[in-house]
Design a protein with these regions (language model features):
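A generic structural micro-feature
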Residues: 11-13, 87-95, 115-120
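A short coil-to-beta-strand element that immediately follows conserved catalytic motifs
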Residues: 66-75
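Conserved Nudix-box catalytic region and its N-terminal flanking loop in Nudix hydrolases
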Residues: 23-65
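Short, well-ordered beta-strand micro-motif
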Residues: 21, 98-102, 125-127
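Active-site-adjacent beta-strand/loop module that shapes the phosphate/pyrophosphate-binding cleft
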Residues: 80-110, 144
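Short, charged/polar surface micro-motifs in flexible loops or helix N-caps
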Residues: 25-27, 35-36, 46, 75-81, ...
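Nudix hydrolase/Nudix homology domain
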Residues: 33-37, 108-161
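Acidic, metal-coordinating catalytic segment for phosphate/diphosphate chemistry
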Residues: 1-18, 24, 89
Length: 161
């Protein structure tokens, strides 16, 4: 299936769905050998797919677990640039729906996930209070997870260099 993304000249846009997975005071992120940062569990929404279906699919693909959605938590407008990889040199604009996933009560996961460029991914449980010590995206996650929220948050970040 085709992701909802496109490139026009030096601009790249993607519609993304991601899960916020918290177990025992830790939040789940993913890393890989190619990148020097961690990123949230999720990926591009496919054409004709709802964001809820996309987050269920991606969370399962990346963790091997069928987490249930608790609620839509954040709509994130993200502007950034990449210094390497497939997006090198592009001005990136991403709109992401972040869903809080229901905890399972355990952190045991089996991942056999790869990036679009076929690089093996590794799951990382990061203690929420230590998240600021990591280069992890989205950058708002530690602040979001340490405050109470009753509705859907709209967050805009601009990390273009």
């Amino acid at each position: 299936m085709q992701d909802c993304c496109f490139t026009h000249e030096n601009n790249w846009f993607r519609y993304r769905a991601a899960g916020i997975i918290v177990e025992d005071g830790c939040v789940l992120f993913i890393g890989n050998e190619r990148e020097d940062y961690l990123y949230s569990v999720g990926e591009g929404v496919h054409m004709g797919e709802t964001a809820e279906d996309a987050v269920r699919r991606e969370v399962f693909e990346e963790t091997g677990v069928k987490y249930e959605i608790d609620r839509l938590a954040v709509i994130h407008e993200n502007f950034f640039n990449e210094n390497n990889g497939l997006l090198k040199g592009l001005d990136c604009h991403e709109i992401a729906f972040y869903y809080l996933m229901k905890p399972r009560g355990e952190k045991v996961l089996e991942s056999d996930s790869y990036t679009v460029g076929h690089v093996k991914e590794q799951l990382r449980w990061i203690p929420i209070e230590e998240l600021g010590n990591y280069k992890a995206f989205p950058s708002f996650m530690q602040d979001y997870l340490t405050h109470e929220h009753s509705g859907i948050e709209h967050i805009v970040t601009d990390e273009r260099k």
